[in-house]
Amino acid sequence: MAESMQRIASAFESARDLTLEAAAVASSRLGESSYFHYSKSIDSESLPGLLNSRYTREVRDGMKRVMSLMGSGDSSIELETHFADIVKNIGSDDVKVRRMVSVYLLRYAETNPNLALLSINSIQRSLSDSNPDVRALALKTLSDINIASLYPIILHSLKKTVIDSSEVVRCQVAMTLLKLFKEQGISIKDDVMPMLKSLLADSEPSVVSAALLLFQKAFAQELQLLHGHYRRYCSILNQLTENAQAIMIDIFIAYAKEYLPRPMVRDTSSDAEAIQLPDSFNQIPFPVYDVEYDHDLNLFLSSLKKLLHSPNAMVIVAVSKAFYQLSSPKTFKDSGIVDSLLRLTVSSYICSEIKELVLQSILVYCCSDPSLFRSHYKRFFLMPSDTENISIFKLKILSILVSDSNCKHIVNELKFVAGTEQSASILVEVSNTLSVCAQISSKWSSQIISWLLDRISSNTPIDKEVTASQINVLRSLIQKDPIKHIATVVKLSKMLSNHDLLPSAKAPIIWLLGEYVQVEPRICPDVLRRLLPQFSKEHAHVRLQILNLAAKLLSHDVDSYSGDMEYDIGTSRIGQMFEAALQLAKFDDEYDVRDRARMLASIFEQKRYEIATLLLQAPKPYPMASLNYCRDSFNLSALNLYPDMENYYELLPWNADPQASDRTPCEVKDYSKLKNSFSSSSYFGRNEVEFTNKPKRSASVSSVPSNTFTSSHGKKYQLQSLDEFFSDVSARQSVPKAKRVIIEESTSEETDHTDDESGSSSGDESTESSYVSSSEEETTE
């Protein structure tokens, strides 16, 4: 009783010694706030005590404080002064502590290289740790320490761990090799290449994923390394990581263009000879056709279809790129890629940045073949949740998909957006899309011109940039049929004085009036008279167009002059206005305006009126909407894509003479066989050949079962059934002094030696077999 009371008193004494700090740490498991206050109490004096403590919990608290100071940029504690106390914990048994020390080393190793080198031995010893996470962390820490003299040590460690039994460590080997290649460059190619070949032949998909990243970043041109892995990679494509799937697709596109035969297109409506798949996506001349693909190319395309339902949007975009570059429009449409891409545009689980990339991909495909997405044009109507960039790309897609059958719905949608949208950039793109719709037919052209003119003339406050874009659209549409739109030109001329227009809006109107000199010359002189007094206050582009307008008026006036006397510029009212504009332009600040004034003065002073007529009054071709007539599908600059997307969709040419290559699968390296462990998997996974019936050794041991089992170490053990085990119960009760005989059969020599000893023992003694090690072996007297 006294002893029990003493134990209780000792427990209370230990509980009283529990400090407030330890209690705060314990309560931190319930929330972050309590630990935050406790962490604040760790100052520069108490931190070394925690870092040098023999208790892992206190060391972890100290390292958490260090991480907090590093992350917040707090300079209240000079962490560099505690370098030795922190780094010595690199050999801690706690993996979390090791990770935090590694992060600290990454930050401060360069400031204390000598002290950092003292931890290398501990890190190298961790490469032999039984925990694969610890081994991978040690390898990562070695590569993160940015000290040039460590390169030989890191390379030696990589050569050792590239055949590690854990796939986690081998993945880290690939990442470390990539890091070394970025630092050292092509100089270490000979050292990295053998390890890369080993990683590419790995049986684990996770290791292959890391190896493909290394291959793409460091050896993208060494495609011949993939010959023996091509077919295996196609079969395990869906097992790779999502990032590696996109990488492998890009690599195999280049591989197929270089080493695989180009698909053949055969016209099924005639007996014409088959042709090679054209370089451009939509240049197949046959209305009905079939495509013959090489076996290996078809294997790759078939494996891609499994990824169309991937949760990663970039994987689906990569799949669409592969079909776009390697197949025909018919195969592209039949593969289901269109539905997968459309699903991404409306998914609520995808961020706006990814949707922008998906829409740019669709824009490229629509420019190549609008029929792919034309039936889904309503999926590109603007939504209230769309960002500005998403809306702009949708409008560009609509401008390509517009046709006579869907023009009514698209125009109505654009008018609605123009009346509700506030963003100037979106409204400018709406105007550009309307200009494409107006080119469908003269009916739509008249309706859109009337609507745009009403929008500009209304008192509704509109951004000047939007007004300028609408005027430019009007100019391009009026130029197509100037006689029909004289009234519209008169209204535009009045806007020069009634509206506060941007230079980008004024200059097109003045240019359009100059083109109308031959159609209706009575409008232009009065406009020029009102523009000349404001010449010096206008923008350079506007001043240049005023000078051109004066020259066009004078040239037309000279051509239409029918008097008997020679035309006199000085006595003509139009000639006088031209002289005034010429005089103002000669002293202009802009070189372009002065140069144009000198050229025009030279022409008219030397009376070269024919040249003036050809130069100023020649009919100009009216502009066309480039997106609606995207004949060259590879001219991506006209689509205003992001620079990275332009590079991503750069077309790779087919190799005209692909080299014959052996794509027979090479030997796969399975490192899981190196794992030495005795478990249920090692037992039940054994080949049936290992379970054999052994012959009876002697009559004295006839009761011992003859079944044997061979362990993963090569040792043999006898097995016993449940009935045989319980059959010896009565014998053991009748002979209480009998000793247990445990027999181990590791080799044939040990078996013979055991038989000799068993023959000299008593035959009445019972035996019992079980799984034992050599340290438990006993013999009978």
From Swiss-Prot:
GO BP annotation list: Golgi to vacuole transport; protein targeting to vacuole
Domain of life per record: Eukaryota
Annotated Acidic residues bias: 746-758
Topological category with respect to the lipid bilayer: Peripheral membrane protein
Region spans: Disordered: 694-713, 731-781
Principal cellular location given in the protein's record: Golgi
Key words, A-Z: Cytoplasmic vesicle, Golgi apparatus, Membrane, Protein transport, Repeat, Transport
Function field: Part of the AP-3 complex, an adaptor-related complex which is not clathrin-associated. The complex is associated with the Golgi region as well as more peripheral structures. It facilitates the budding of vesicles from the Golgi membrane and may be directly involved in trafficking to the vacuole.
Record protein name field: AP-3 complex subunit beta
Provenance organism: Eremothecium gossypii (strain ATCC 10895 / CBS 109.51 / FGSC 9923 / NRRL Y-1056)
Source species taxonomy: Eukaryota, Fungi, Dikarya, Ascomycota, Saccharomycotina
